[in-house]
A protein has these predicted regions:
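Alpha-helical coupling/stalk and coiled-coil linker elements that connect catalytic or binding modules
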Residues: 1-407, 414-444, 466-467
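ATPase nucleotide-binding head domains, primarily ABC-like/P-loop NTPase cores
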Residues: 353, 360-575
């Protein structure tokens, strides 16, 4: 499908490019005709040639408008080409198409670091099809803090948008025209909350009447040589320019930081228009106000250009009228503008999720239960290529807290991440990498990888104790899914074994659901004391004809094989 879309977008781009060049040539010819006809009109004092010259000038400006329209269509077609090329490269070569979200990585989080949620080749990197800074930020927020209460609504929204490939790509192409940054939203927020003193009623009336009186006085006075009218015109010119120069600093202050942002706001307007068409029930009605703001900022952009602004404001107070209109806009819409832009970001995230569902039609939407039970049939890691992915069945509930054993490299950590990622996908309303899934969407608590922090003076063991303390505190507040991988690695074997057993018993007392992976066989014997709560499962390795094999399939019971000694002998480390 992406190759078909790529071919269509390429043809459209070629078509618009030809039209763009044709209109550019027509503009040039029209301008030349306007110059020649205008010269003829002046030279011959002919009203007919003058009328034709005016028509040529009007046509020239119409062609400018047409040229801009075609330029926008050409940019959108080019963006669609890039979108489809990236999707093809992602599917065929595994090339991630967008930003990895590493800049949103929190210092501490219950699962983000352990499950590779952000950063290179992370879940964010895999899902992300956003372009705006705000879209990226919203995606990171949803991955880090999913709304577990609206899963079914999210599922329905994703299901509805998944088949709408053409609409999604059009929306994404328009979003790619937005060149935003964190500072833009900071400035916009500051501008929105900063009150602007409105122009007084007298000044509003004066800016309408004065240019009219000035223009009439100047025309009549100089045509009929009326000195009184000439004096009035000169006086009003001085007053008009004085008023303009008084307000120019206010105008510049009001638009400070928004120079040349009108094009970006217009791109936002295009995205909002698409949202209004696709989701009429939202009753957004924001595209027109955003377009108005874009035009007002555009109109005020040349206020500092004296060659333009002096004649404009002497004859019409043009910039003051636009400034007054901006004040009116601000008073009406300033509190709504950021939520409108956030709607674009939310739709970018929804398109990213729908894109994921579209790319993986074999994934399933999990059913939800209220019985604190997690059941996956043929669950696999969604970020592992299908031809390399090994799937397993698992059930976790009050009677099935799993003690997981396995030799080195047998797949324990990958399996824990598989469960964690699919639980997160469930909370996001996304389909999961499984044949069947029935899930209670429990909050995730994970401890799999930690590190020393020399700058903080904290050891690995101290960091792990802190993490376990945080997990226990969270479990006191609510029931959670816990995934722990080889805990207490920073202490001696006897202390580690005793500590691990006590932690597992504490997890059971707090009604946690989940898995603890361990190499310690004695820890696994704890299942005899809690036969109604604990079950042993394992991953095995096999040494056949001097070769180590893994099948990465989950089995019942405790791991029986060890491979550390074999690997060290193979590498010549030990005899």
């Amino acid at each position: 499908m992406y190759k078909e879309k790529l071919e269509t977008a390429t043809q459209l781009y070629k078509q618009y490019h030809q039209q763009y060049n044709a209109v550019a040539f027509a503009r040039l010819i029209d301008l030349l005709f306007a110059i020649v006809i205008g010269y003829k009109a002046i030279n011959e004092s002919s009203w007919l040639w003058g009328f034709l010259a005016v028509l040529m000038i009007v046509l020239f400006f119409l062609l400018i408008g047409k040229h801009k329209q075609i330029a926008v269509k050409r940019r959108i077609a080019k963006a669609k080409i890039a979108i489809n090329e990236r999707e093809i490269a992602f599917i065929e070569q595994g090339v991630y198409p967008a930003d990895n979200g590493k800049d949103f990585e929190p210092a501490q989080h219950p699962y983000a670091y352990d499950l590779d949620v952000l950063g290179e080749k992370s879940l964010f990197h895999y899902l992300n099809r956003t372009h705006t800074y705000l879209g990226r930020k919203r995606l990171a927020e949803q991955l880090l803090y999913p709304e577990g209460t609206a899963i079914l609504a999210h599922q329905e929204a994703i299901k509805a948008l998944t088949p709408q490939l053409a609409w999604r790509q059009t929306f994404m192409a328009h979003a790619e025209q937005i060149d935003d940054s964190p500072s833009f939203y900071d400035r916009l927020q500051q501008w929105a909350v900063t009150p602007t003193p409105p122009m007084g009623k007298f000044m509003r009336v004066f800016t309408v009447i004065s240019p009219i009186v000035f223009t009439l006085s100047a025309i009549i006075g100089y045509i009929y040589d009326y000195e009184v009218l000439k004096s009035i015109a000169k006086l009003l010119l001085t007053i008009n320019l004085s008023v303009f120069f008084f307000y120019i600093s206010k105008i510049n202050k009001e638009k400070l930081g928004f120079e040349r942002t009108y094009a970006m706001l217009y791109a936002f307007k295009s995205c909002i228009s698409l949202i209004e068409e696709r989701f009429p029930d939202k009753k957004l009605q924001a595209s027109k106000p955003i377009a108005q703001l874009s035009r007002l900022l555009d109109d005020l952009d040349n206020v500092s250009n004296i060659l333009v602004s002096i004649p404009l404001n002497a004859f019409s107070f043009y910039h003051l009228h636009r400034y007054s209109a901006l004040q009116t806009w601000k008073a009406t819409y300033s509190k709504e503008v950021l939520p409108w832009l956030e709607t674009v970001a939310d739709t970018e995230v929804l398109c990213s999720f729908a894109n994921f569902a579209y790319n993986y039609p074999q994934f399933v939407y999990p059913t939800l239960n209220n019985s604190y039970r997690v059941s996956f049939e043929a669950v696999g890691h969604p970020l592992i290529a299908e031809k390399e992915r090994i799937t397993n069945d698992i059930v976790l509930d009050e009677a099935h807290f799993v003690l997981l054993t396995g030799s080195n490299m047998s797949g324990k950590s990958t399996f824990l991440r598989t469960l964690g990622i699919n639980m997160l996908l469930t909370q996001l309303g996304l389909p999961v990498c499984a044949k069947k899934a029935d899930v209670h969407p429990l909050p995730l608590l994970v401890s799999m990888r930690l590190s020393d922090s020399l700058s903080d003076g904290k050891s690995y063991f101290f960091a792990e104790i802190n993490r376990i303390e945080q997990i226990m505190a969270a479990l006191k507040r609510e029931r959670c899914m816990v995934l722990l991988d080889e805990i207490l690695r920073g202490t001696n074997s006897e202390d580690k074994q005793y500590g691990t057993i006590k932690i597992i018993e504490r997890l059971l007392s707090l009604q946690a659901i989940g898995i603890v992976a361990t190499h310690d066989i004695e820890v696994c014997r704890l299942s005899k004391q809690y036969p109604d709560r604990l079950v042993n499962k394992c991953f095995e390795s096999d040494i056949s004809q001097g070769v180590l094999h893994f099948d990465y399939k989950l089995r019942e019971g405790i791991c029986q094989n060890r491979n550390a000694t074999f690997l060290m002998r193979e590498r010549g480390i030990i005899a």
